[in-house]
């Protein structure tokens, strides 16, 4: 599930 969280953070950036 870490990948999903990182993906969301990258989306914000």
Swiss-Prot record:
Family membership noted in the UniProt record: Belongs to the frog skin active peptide (FSAP) family. Temporin subfamily.
Q: What is this protein called in UniProt?
A: Temporin-1To
| Expression (tissue specificity) | Expressed by the skin glands.
Keywords noted in UniProt: Amidation, Amphibian defense peptide, Antibiotic, Antimicrobial, Immunity, Innate immunity, Secreted
Write down the species.
Answer: Rana temporaria
Which biological process terms from the Gene Ontology are attached to this UniProt entry? defense response to bacterium; innate immune response
Superkingdom classification of source: Eukaryota
Q: Give compartment(s).
A: Secreted
Q: List-wise, which residues carry Leucine amide? A: 13
Instruction: List GO terms (cellular component aspect).
Output: extracellular region
What does the protein in this record do?
Antimicrobial peptide.
Q: What is the lineage of its organism?
A: Eukaryota, Metazoa, Chordata, Craniata, Vertebrata
